Each structure stands twice: as structure tokens, then as C-alpha cells.
């Protein structure tokens, strides 16, 4: 398990570095207003994916050990196509500010992205974490290569370079996933069983509960973008989105751990083992994340202005406000994957609902008055409420003593020893 976590973390770190370079390139070329347009475009695609992943989401990971590939794949693909068509036609009702020329692209990109995600979740469900990680890493690699050609070699400065880059990233990732699952795809049409009632029932059952939480969580995490666009302007969205992206990079630690944790729990039947595993991973995740957040908070405004451009110096102030909530949300990510792994998706939904109440009340109150500062306060409080809700229920149902929540030196030494062992083994394998 530890080896898979290390591999996942390494992949996510590499992807984060590339995504950071992408953010820098877009900020320098497009400016704060153009970066705001890009952030809203990507966020709108993510909004459509919430509905696609009612069937094509994390429920695939949970159901992969229990249903044939063909049935899950066919049901997921048809559903994602339907959602892309419906949402593509009605997306401007949700976001009237989306440029008409981008509507069709948003619809098509959401469909291709969903196909790529289906492959990714099959790989995770089979606990083929290495392959899933390589599949994920390909997206930012293809994106930055496309952006480099479009903006640096061709010297263009419009948003369509980013759109073309997304096409390359999503489609390339999908093709790689097909290759990694080629045995399953080769047998796709050999299975003559056309009874999809059971798999559809399970996909909707688990997917609806899980995606309800993701739908609510989407507004917790990204409603501030749309409120800033409505009450202030896209330039403020650009600065705020960059600050959020940098701060949320801390979640690479917890999401790397949670991905392996989720696959392990979904394939295990021991509740006590799942609880102990979750607690141990939460403690080490918090310790590492706290150190990383301190480093981010110490960086001055001049650093961000130098890296992203003179319009982005305000990122430092935003990141410092977000920091406590970012740290608390690390706990939410680990505990949320615990509840998803045991099939209790509704717990994540209830936690997200609590956070959404905070987001709506504070967002509509603070953002029109305090712009990005109000948005940062809103997000930080919402993140914290999410984590507290799940933590309270987790400690109530788990039989842990108070001192079990303390990270001991012996545990740190064990983690370090395990890391050394895995790196040593990896070096030996490479020789």
C-alpha cells in the first residue's frame, strides 16, 4: 500500500508542477482577466461532469469488482453522452456569462473528459494504481505542450489555445486508457448478455448519493468564482483562482493518500481495519500538510507578482486567509474517502450541505462588499465546517481513545522507515 501511495504522490507532484507552469504561462500571456475566463471555462466543464459522474464517477471504483467491464462501460458512456447533449444546450441558463462561441466546446470537452475518467476509475477499481497515475499525468503534459506551441511559438494570445490544449489532453488520456484496458476493450463485444438492469440500478444508487455530495461540494469550492464574476469582474476571478490553485496544491498530499485508501477499503470487508487505516493516514497527512502550508504562507506578494505577473501580487493575502481551511479540508478528504469506500456516500453529502449553507450565506454577504478577501473567508470557513462534520461522526462510530489521535514519534519513525524501504526497493528494481 505504501508503495502505491508513494507512486501516486510522485505522480501528483509532477502533475502539480506542470499545472503550476500552465497557470504561470496563462497568467503571463492572458493577464488577470484572461486567466479569469480560463478559470470559469474549466469550472463550467467541471460542473457538467458532476452530472455525468452520477453514473461515471467513483461508483465505478466501488462496483468494478462486482460487475463486468462491458456493462459498466456501456451504461457509463451512454449516460455521459446524454448529459453532454442536455447540459450543452442548457449551460447558459446556469452561466449566462459564458461566451456563445465556447458553449459547443464546453459540451464536447466534458464528454471526452468523462470517457477518460471512466478508464481511470476502472484502473483504480482494479487497484492498478501505477497505470491510473500515468494516465492522469498525461493530461497536463499534453496540455502544456499544446499551450507552448500556441502561445510561445505561434505568438497568439486568445483563449482558444487553452481550448485546443484541453482537446489534446482529454483525448490523449482517453486513448492511453483504452490501451491500458485493451484486454477489456477487446472482449467488449464478445459478451452477449444485454441485461443492464442490475448494473444500472447499482450505478445510479451509489453514484447519485456520491454525486449529490459532489454537486453540493462544487458550489462550496467554486461558487465564489461565479459570484466574483457577477459582482466584481473577471480580473478578480483570475487572481482568486490562481491563489486557490496554489493553496489547494496542498491537497495533493491527502488526495494521493486517499486514492489508495479508497481502493483498499472498497476491496476490504473489515470495518475496524478501515477505521484504523483512516486514522493513521489522517495523522500523517495533517503533519505533512501543515508544514507545506507554513511554507506557502511565508512567501511574499513580490514572489507571486514575479512568477505570475504584476496583476497577481494579491495572491499572498488570499492564500494566508485560505490556509486554515485548506488544512482542515485535508481531514475531510481522507474521511470522505473512508465513507465512500464503505459505501456510505450520504455522509459526504451531509457534510457538503453544511458547507454549502456557509458558502451561500457568507458568499452573498461578503463577496459584494470585500471582493477577493470575502471570497477567501467564505471558502476557509466552508472547508472547516466540512471537515468538522465528518470528524465528529467518525470519532463517534470508531472505538478510539483520545491518545490514539496523537501522532507519536514511533509512528513517524515507522513511516520514515517504510519510505526508506520503498525507495531502496525502487532503486534496486531500477538497477
Protein language model annotation of sequence segments:
Residues 1-54, 205-235, 355, 360-361, ...:
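Signature of the first transmembrane helix
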Residues 4-15, 40-41, 45-97, 101, ...:
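Membrane-water interface segments that mark the loop-to-transmembrane alpha-helix transition
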Residues 32-36, 93-106, 234, 298-327, ...:
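Interfacial segments at transmembrane-helix termini and the short loops linking adjacent helices
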Residues 59-68, 114-138, 266, 324-351:
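Membrane-interface junctions at transmembrane-helix termini in multi-pass inner-membrane proteins
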Residues 104, 130, 134-135, 155, ...:
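Interhelical loop/hinge segments that connect adjacent transmembrane helices in multipass membrane
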Residues 133-185, 244, 354-358, 372-396:
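Hydrophobic alpha-helical transmembrane segments
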Amino acid at each position: 500500500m505504501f508503495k502505491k501511495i508513494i507512486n501516486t504522490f510522485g505522480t501528483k507532484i509532477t502533475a502539480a508542477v506542470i499545472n503550476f507552469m500552465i497557470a504561470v504561462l496563462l497568467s503571463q500571456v492572458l493577464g488577470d482577466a484572461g486567466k479569469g475566463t480560463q478559470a470559469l471555462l474549466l469550472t463550467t466543464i467541471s460542473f457538467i461532469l458532476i452530472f455525468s459522474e452520477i453514473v461515471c464517477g467513483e461508483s465505478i471504483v466501488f462496483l468494478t469488482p462486482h460487475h463486468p467491464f462491458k456493462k459498466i462501460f456501456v451504461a457509463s458512456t451512454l449516460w455521459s453522452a446524454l448529459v453532454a447533449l442536455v447540459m450543452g444546450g442548457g449551460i447558459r441558463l446556469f452561466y449566462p456569462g459564458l461566451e456563445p462561441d465556447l458553449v459547443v466546446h464546453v459540451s464536447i470537452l466534458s464528454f471526452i473528459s468523462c470517457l477518460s475518467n471512466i478508464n481511470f476509475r476502472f484502473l483504480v477499481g482494479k487497484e492498478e494504481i501505477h497505470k491510473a497515475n500515468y494516465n492522469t499525468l498525461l493530461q497536463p503534459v499534453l496540455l502544456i505542450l499544446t499551450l507552448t506551441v500556441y502561445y510561445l511559438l505561434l505568438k497568439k494570445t486568445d483563449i482558444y489555445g487553452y481550448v485546443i490544449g484541453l482537446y489534446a489532453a482529454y483525448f490523449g488520456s482517453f486513448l492511453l486508457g483504452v490501451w491500458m484496458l485493451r484486454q477489456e476493450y477487446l472482449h467488449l463485444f464478445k459478451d452477449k448478455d444485454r441485461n443492464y438492469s442490475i448494473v444500472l440500478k447499482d450505478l445510479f444508487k451509489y453514484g447519485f448519493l456520491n454525486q449529490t455530495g459532489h454537486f453540493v461540494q462544487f458550489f462550496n469550492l467554486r461558487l465564489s468564482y461565479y459570484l466574483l464574476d457577477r459582482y466584481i469582474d473577471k480580473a478578480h476571478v483570475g487572481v482568486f483562482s490562481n491563489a486557490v490553485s496554489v493553496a489547494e496544491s496542498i491537497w495533493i498530499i491527502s488526495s494521493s493518500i486517499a486514492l489508495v485508501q479508497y481502493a483498499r477499503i472498497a476491496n476490504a470487508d473489515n470495518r475496524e481495519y478501515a477505521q484504523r487505516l483512516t486514522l493513521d493516514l489522517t495523522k500523517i497527512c495533517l503533519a505533512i500538510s501543515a508544514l507545506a502550508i507554513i511554507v506557502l504562507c511565508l512567501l511574499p506578494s513580490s514572489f507571486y507578482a514575479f512568477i505570475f505577473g504584476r496583476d497577481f501580487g494579491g495572491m499572498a493575502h488570499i492564500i494566508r486567509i485560505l490556509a486554515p481551511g485548506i488544512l482542515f479540508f485535508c481531514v475531510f478528504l481522507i474521511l470522505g474517502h473512508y465513507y465512500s469506500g464503505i459505501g456510505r456516500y450520504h455522509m459526504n453529502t451531509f457534510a457538503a450541505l453544511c458547507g454549502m449553507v456557509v458558502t451561500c450565506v457568507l458568499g452573498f454577504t461578503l463577496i459584494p462588499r470585500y471582493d477577493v478577501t470575502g471570497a477567501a473567508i467564505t471558502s476557509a470557513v466552508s472547508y472547516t465546517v466540512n471537515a468538522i462534520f465528518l470528524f465528529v461522526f467518525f470519532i463517534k462510530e470508531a472505538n478510539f481513545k483520545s491518545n490514539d489521535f496523537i501522532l507519536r514519534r514511533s509512528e513517524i519513525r515507522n513511516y520514515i522507515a517504510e519510505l526508506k524501504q520503498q525507495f531502496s526497493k525502487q532503486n534496486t528494481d531500477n538497477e
